[in-house]
Structures are given as C-alpha cells and as structure tokens.
Amino acid sequence: MDKKLLIAGAIALMSVPSLAQQVKVYDTGTKWDARLNHLVEGRTMQVLSANKSTQTVTPQSNISVSVSVNDAAAVEAAIKAAGYEAEIITDELVVAHIPASYITTLAEQPNVLFINAPRQFHKLMHNVRPETGVTKVTAGEGLETPFTGKGVVIGVIDQGFEYKHPAFKGRVVRYGANSGGGMLTERMPTSDRLDDVGHATHVANIAAGSKVEGSDYYGIATGADLILVSSKFTDTAVEAQAKSIKDYAEKNGQPWVINMSFGSIIGPHDGSTSHDQNMSKLCGEGGIMVAAMGNEGNDKFHAYREITSDSEPVYLYMKTDNNYNPNKIILSELWGTATDAQAHLTIKPCIINGSRLYEPTDEQLDNLSGFSTGIDPYNNRQYARLHLNSQVLASILKVTGTSYKVVWQVSGKQGDSFHAWIDGSNYYGNNFMAMSVGKYKAHSGDAEYMVGEGAATIGKAIAVASYNAASRFTNLNGSTYDAGVGETGDISNFSSHGPLVGEATPKPAVAGPGGTVLSAFSKNSAQFENYRSYQVQKVNSEGGTYYYGMMSGTSMATPAVSGIIALWLEANPKLTYENILDIMKATGRRDNHVGKVDANNWNATWGFGKIDAYNGLKKALEMKGQSGIDETLNSEAPVTISKNHNEWRVLFNNNESFATLQVFNTNGQLVSSEYVDAPRCGTERVVNLANFAPGVYLFKVSTTASSTTRKLVVK
C-alpha cells in the first residue's frame, strides 16, 4: 500500500452503556419540542438552513421531523393515511415530512411519544483555509497488504461530490441525490447542487478513491464499494440516508462503514438525543459509523459554570463579530447538569447597555420568537435555547444604540451547575468572552466538551480527532505555504476536544491524519476559483481535466479512519463497535505528542492516540482467530508486511498449513530462514534488519499455495 496518504497511529476503548429511550410528558402536557410552540400557536420560527443562513418557518411551511414512537408501523401508517410522507428508521423512530399545522394532530396519536424539532448540521472543514496533509511514504517502507476493503461498503454522507472524478470511476454502487430523503439510485446524478467547496469529493477520495494515472493522491480502501450520498445535513435526512446505506449493504451480505464528516455545536453533548440513540441502533455486527469531532479546538464556544450564591446570578457574555455577523445573530444553548426533570435554574437572555441591565419579563420571554426553555424528555435535563437576531431582543427591551452586550443570566441555588454552547461556526466570530461592566462580570469560555453534535455524539460512532500529517504544502505554481495547523505529527490546532458530558464513552476515540491533507478537488464547486492557491496537482483523464488539492479538518481525519476500518472489516467482517474500540485501545500509537493519558490509555484531545492500520489489522485478525472457526485456507495472499527501516513485520492474514520466511543476498545465498508450523490468522513474525549487514537482499515468504518475494534494503 505505497500511498502518499499517511496512515499511522491507532485506537481502542471501554464499553459504552446504551441509553434506553426515555420519553415522558412533563408539566406542559405537550408531546413536541418547545421550539415548535411558535408554529403550533400560529407564529413563525427561526431555523438554520443548509447554506448557514437563518430561515423563517411559518405554520404553513412543510417541515421534516423525527418522531419518537412506541409502534413505528402504526405511526407511519397514520401519517401516510393523512397524505404525508413517513419512513421508519428504527422501531423507536419515524421520520415524517408534514405541514407544521399537522403537529398537534400527529401528537394525538397514542403511539407518538415526542415530536422533535428539526436540526441542521454542517461540514467540518477547518475554517481558516483548506490544507493538505499527504506525506510521501519513503521508498521501501510502508504497509503492503492484500486487504483493500474489497466486499465492504463505504457510505459517504456529505456535500460537494464531483461524481465524474476518475477517483470514483467504476467504484460507486449507489448514489443518493440532493434530497432530504434516503432513496438510493444506480443512476449518477448530473451534479451536486450542494457543492460549495468540493468537501465530499475530498473526503470520499481519502477514504476509498482509486489511483488515477498521473496522481499519487488516492485513498485507503481502494477495493471498497462506494455509496455517495449528497445530503441536506438535517437530522431527518441523515437518519434516512444512514438506514438506506445499511439496508443496501446488508441486503447484499456486506459489512459497511458510514463516514460522517459533519456535525453541529448546538445540543446537549451527552449522546441522549433521539437522533443519537436511533443512529446507534442502526449499528451492529459488521456495521460501523465514523464521525468527525469538530474543528473548534481554538475557540471559546463552551462554558461550564457553577452557582456560588443563591442571590448572585451568573452571566455569560455572548459576543458577536460585527465584521462577520453585522445582524448580531446568536445561536446558543444552555443545559443544566441535574437529571431529575426539575427546573432548578432561572434562565434569561438579557442585554447590558452601558452599566444598565435590561431584563425581559416572563411575558416578553413567552412572546420572544427564537427563545425556548423546558425539560428535555430524553435526558431529563433543563435547557434554554436562543436563536435570533439580537436586534429583535434589543427592540423588545427598548435598548438604543448598537454597542450593547447580549448575555445569559442564570440564577439558582448554590451548587447548581450548567453547560452552555454558542455557535461561532455558522455565525463566525461569536464566542463566550470575558466582560466587566460595573457590577456585571463574566468569564471567558473554553474549548472543552466540544464533541460534535449529530455525528460524533452518536453513542456507537467512532469519534475522530485530527493530527497533522504535514504542516506545509506546495501548490501547482510551485509556491510553498505553511498550512497554519501546527507542528507535523502534533494534534491539529483546530481539533475539537472532548469529553462527552456525563458519560464514560470515549470521545474522541482516536486521532487520524487531518491537518494538511492532499486529496481530490471538485472543479464543479462554487468556490473552485477561490481555491486555486490550494490546488497541488491536475491530471488529464478520458478527455477531462481533474484536480487534487489541500484541505484540513477533522472532516479529513475521519475518512482516513473510515478507510482503515474498511480494511479491518474485510479481514474480519463481524467486527462490532465494541471490537473496534478494543482494537483502538490496544493499538493506538501514543507518542510524545499524545502526552498524559488516563488508566484506560485515553485523553480528551487524542482519544486512544494515533490510529495504527497495521497493528489494528493484526488485532482484527486475532479476534477472527478467536471466533472458534479454525479452517486452514492456504490462501494466495497469505501475509501483510509492515516495512520499517529497522524491521519487517510479517502478519498472517489467514490460517496456513505452514510458512517459511527466508532472506537471500544478491548472490543467491541463504542468509536467514525460519519455518512456521501451521500459523493462524493474526500470527506475527518479525525480521530484525539489525542482524544483516548493509546491502540489498531478497525476502521470500512461501506457503502451500503461494510464494512471494520482495526486495529488502538494509542501510
């Protein structure tokens, strides 16, 4: 596997307790998210759209909602009988496309437990600029394996596919068109209407792109079957699309990996949402989800506070950037830590202007579109959500001028505590900043507890952090740039930190190469001309010109891990999420960059360390050997070889009757020989190069059905 895509490191983990779905009706007596109240009451609601703009939804609008249910078939049938679209995702979740006016009618269904408000996710490409991180593997070193992901389905749910890029030629078994549904088709779409920067093209090539003549920038699982799904990145779309990928793979008897290089800052960050729980239910033996952690490692989008006095509120200053966000739009959520379904906190959005505090009345809050509060039925935690143009709040409170500060005001009993998050990605420049205005003070936020919502927070998703495969790149014009991601080999400065709130689930689980990565570019993207400086290679293929370039992000680290897991699944198709975590825990490469880890070899920045393709494969084969099946295959591709400058490690891919490992000099003289009797899959032998004088040798592996010879250079 002599690829320019650097694969080095590994992962693993502890068991993850499943969250039993708990949905109750509390004091309001309603069975829908409080954010839907305005629509139910005949008013408008603000939502985030796929292009990061704020969109107004009216009671007459059609919306997509996920519905927690007791009887999925009965609820689906009732919705369809009313003339609307519905699809069963799991036995506990139905996705429905309904007019907002139908919410109350749907809630009357006895098998409906709770109607969730729509959520919007976004791509997790590093915001500063695209970077490339492809490191050339030194000649004579690297990983040589017959495992290519053959027979494994890799589903990429993303935005920005150049479908005709030769990296995907002959590899795509199904497409998902630009829709909010999960329908797959054999027909290639004419274009991806959601292609702004070619994100999906870059991602899919890292995971599994083919080698194109004239380019060295190809993927990891080059034999895998691809399903390319262009998604609107709403929760309902992702749920339906993930189910379709799973259904296709399982119908064809194939293991599968779903790559999710997207997420959101807003949510409880505890894996409790209906979306997280039901996406986890789709996973199982031979079915793995891999998700990007996020790119907020440098930002102050999170805050944790504890009430220290019954009489003194805590303030959080939600700063906006006038250069990027002149309308002062704020999207923020606050979540209490108590899980007893009680409202311990009094939470209000307020304004400080000069030295005066403007505090809304309860009536003003009730009428404030974009503000909602309540008890979440999935985790029993109190929450408050704010999504509005802050000028609206200023108008209601009769605040003049534009230099005012919008704050959360939180009161409670001593010892009460909460987490808060602010979206500074879709609304660039927003963050929690320190403030001191008269008697009103606020401390700055931090970058902790930033596991990406909607993908990485899924209980059974492998959450991936990013380290730097390189720190510089040279473009087509020969100009060399510093990518601005930090030191080569270190954690990418943008990589989001864990942990998950209130859970022992390891998030992240592992780090993959995501800083300065070179991969396929989409020439069809809306921003293609703006990315000319980051193009590193162009090739001519079948009468067309195609491009490769540099991007950075946990979006790029994630498909590297997805591709490696596909190799492991080819070797052992019965691997589960728990098996993958065990592999990562046992084989994660923890060098000096990774630093201090806990008793489980984990920390909140790196997870279990850098992913290690070879040692992970060894562990996967060992697990296969422990399955109780002991068939001797005498295969034609018996070994995987990890070639390093000081040793060659030989790993048996299957059970063999025997093997001989021999080293000859260029005169044909036998220098070293080892006979291995009945090696089992996962058996390893090490050839120590320190035992040989500098020079060129021939390394020969012989089994019943094969004989393989490789050149070995000792320096």
Residue ranges and their predicted role:
Residues 5-14, 18-145, 151-154:
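Autoinhibitory N-terminal propeptides
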Residues 52-56, 252-264, 268-271, 286-293, ...:
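C-terminal subdomain of the subtilisin-like protease fold in secreted/lumenal serine endopeptidases
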Residues 140-238, 253-256, 284-288, 292, ...:
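Subtilisin-like serine protease catalytic core
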Residues 145-147, 159-201, 350-435, 532-545:
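Active-site core segment of subtilase-fold serine proteases
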Residues 180-185, 372-375, 382-383, 467-477, ...:
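Catalytic-core environment of secreted peptidases
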Residues 204, 227-232, 246-254, 330-343, ...:
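Hydrolase catalytic cores
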Residues 253-356, 401-521, 587-588:
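Catalytic-core segments of hydrolase enzymes
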Residues 631-715:
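C-terminal outer-membrane/trafficking sorting elements
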